[in-house]
Amino acid sequence: MTGEDFPEDLPKEDGCGWIWSMKSEPLIKRRVAGVDDPLFLDSLDIYRTSFPVHEQRRIQDFPLAFQDPGFCYEVFLNGEGRVVAMLVTWRREQFVYLEYFAVDASLRGQGAGQRILEELRDAFPHKVILEIDPPEDGISRRRLGFYQRHGFVPNPQFDYIHPPYTDEGEPFPLLLMTHGDLLDEETYRSFVDFHHRHVVAR
């Protein structure tokens, strides 16, 4: 927590289980209610341009995800009310899975992504699990370094393969990262089972 005051018209608890406050103006976080929410539609440009097609859930499959009580789709608005970042998480007792996290290109390098990640990390210490591309080129290595600077560690001990989001797709390898501690075998198995049963369900 930063100790800053919240505007009177904003709840301190965002419905996803963590308290929200930004250290600088003017980002405002909102939880998206579903695929018919205008904020969802406004976030699709960031979603589509930030992730390769094989890593994207089809738009028609999002309604099923929204039915899960632990699914949180959140967007961040600038002072003009424009969506400039998105964060998609799944909350479970053992872990919080960060599925999608992207910042509009206009804000990259200005610390917005860092602040958003720090708020999530601090709200769920030692529970956040995320995935990155294997660090095989400059971009992926910089992404690895970004998360390492914020307390996340890679888990190369697991040969993690992400299932396809569509019947026509192919599985693809990713590197799991966790906050603070390496994944133990039990948590890893629980995560993989959850991921197959819920995240890529269609």
Give the label of every model feature segment.
Residues V75, G81-W90, F95-A102:
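Conserved beta-strand in the GNAT
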Residues V103, G109-D122:
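Conserved acetyl-CoA-binding loop-helix of GNAT-fold acetyltransferases
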Residues F66-V75:
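A short helix-loop-beta-strand connector motif used in the catalytic cores of GNAT acetyltransferases and
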